[in-house]
């Protein structure tokens, strides 16, 4: 499966480019070697990937982005697309993440590194960081995205000063209107 650094906290910023769907664009972005590329497996999204993911550099980790998906759908999608991780973007509870972590660990077994779970949280003018503690045992990374009409990809920026109160050792991604 993937690289051995799947669970290594970032010593330098990591780049995850999300919403890839056009094969030519996927190859072009993969050529610049971001750490991760996100592929949307939520049909209502305008960035929903309908084509098979083309072959890309194995050092670029493929992450499936899911919104309120069942563990069975996620596992099937991982196998069909050789994903190295998942991003949960649909209001999943810590218990949902535990169920998925258990299913992923059972599926992968001891011979391969476990698949990454990234849990996304929508951030508005404030955020209750104490809510993260329940997720820490099951999620490898958090992702903070600006609250908007859609579960993600709204293109808005929240006040990053909120992250100065971040209490966790779990590494995180920053998302929302960055580019």
Model-derived regions: residue spans:
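Conserved N-terminal beta1-alpha1 strand-loop-helix module at the mouth
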Residues: 1-107, 114-179
